[in-house]
Amino acid sequence: MVEPISKSTKRETIQGIVRGIRQDIDGYKQLKSLLKRQRELMQSRDNQGLHHHNEHQSRLCHNLMIKAGERRRMLKSLGFEATAGGMRSLIERLPEPVSEQVSMLWDNLISLVKESKQMNESNGKLLVGQQEVINQLLQRDEQPSVDYGDKR
């Protein structure tokens, strides 16, 4: 049987969730900047710079995933589903001035996540396009070429 958590523990947990959302907003702003830089490195074909950049970007993404997991755990500890819907339910149950502020923060975070996903998908398409060009060039070099009846 699960014991109910105290009022002060609930308050601390909610404060932890809000603090985490604020930190994630900063993290996703940083991720958007990194995704923009990643695209620039890909376009300039800076493989060494891209390698170092991607290590940094991967660490940030890993940290964001850990923080999302912590938020899910905190939501569950408060009796809410560990989903965006659970977060909305929590926000609706907060007192009015607080719920409005947390709702704005949450909406901002969701927007940044969506923008980051779109940028990442765009970078993925650029990478696929670059790989296709490289493959076409490699395949062309493997096939014997004939110009005016003479092999090159």
What does each model-found stretch correspond to?
Residues 2-89:
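Extended, charge-rich alpha-helical scaffolding segments
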Residues 2-4, 86-152:
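Short terminal interaction segments
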